[in-house]
Amino acid sequence: MVKVIASSVRKGNVLDVDGKLYVVLTAQNFHPGKGTPVTQVDMRRIVDGTKVSERWRTTEQVERAFVEDLNFQFLYEDGEGFHFMNPENYDQVVVDVETMGDQKAYLQEGMTCVLSIHEGNPLAVELPRHVTLEIVETEPVVKGQTASSSYKPAILSNGIRTMVPPHIDAGIRVVIATEDNSYVERAKN
């Protein structure tokens, strides 16, 4: 276990709080006008999946568990969960639906993800920062809307809704940020 200050805690970190392991879902630092800066952390207990919210002073020490981050390739999904393979030694790991969370919509066959492994168990999955998806449905362009930088709603091939610039139509491939479902750019290929 390594002691770190609360302000350095990030999404995906594994913390040891009172002898129990938690995966950090979100971590935000708040600096109020008056008072001490604090770090608000939402976590999921690894053993039973219970969600917990903690608030620490940014300078407070918390224990980070030793977790190995390894590259794994996504193979397929079945009733058991999401199957990943380590390309170096061909070991396969199954990640359950709860651990995968909402990220499952972005998984594509052959995609390389970073799995956080603690004592042989997958704790968290980190997707690539950007994925390329196709626009399935979007509103048509309205002439004269080019003066403002307005975005229009669009539905991606994985079913997620996002906002895209007016010049993007259905059938076009775009790059999307996996962290917040936002449009990054039009795909190059």
Curated annotation (Swiss-Prot):
GO cellular component assignments: cytoplasm
InterPro entries, sorted: Elong-fact-P_C (IPR015365), NA-bd_OB-fold (IPR012340), Rib_uL2_dom2 (IPR014722), Transl_elong_fac_P/YeiP (IPR020599), Transl_elong_KOW-like (IPR013185), Transl_elong_P/YeiP_cen (IPR001059), Transl_elong_P/YeiP_CS (IPR013852), Transl_elongation_fac_P (IPR011768)
Molecular functions per Gene Ontology: translation elongation factor activity
Keywords: Cytoplasm, Elongation factor, Protein biosynthesis
Pfam families reported in the protein's UniProt record: EFP (PF01132), EFP_N (PF08207), Elong-fact-P_C (PF09285)
Compartmental location: Cytoplasm
GO biological process: peptide biosynthetic process
Pathway(s) where this gene product acts: Protein biosynthesis; polypeptide chain elongation
UniProt xrefs under NCBIfam families: efp, PRK00529.1
Family note: Belongs to the elongation factor P family.
Role of this protein: Involved in peptide bond synthesis. Stimulates efficient translation and peptide-bond synthesis on native or reconstituted 70S ribosomes in vitro. Probably functions indirectly by altering the affinity of the ribosome for aminoacyl-tRNA, thus increasing their reactivity as acceptors for peptidyl transferase.
Record-given protein name: Elongation factor P
Gene name, Swiss-Prot/TrEMBL: efp
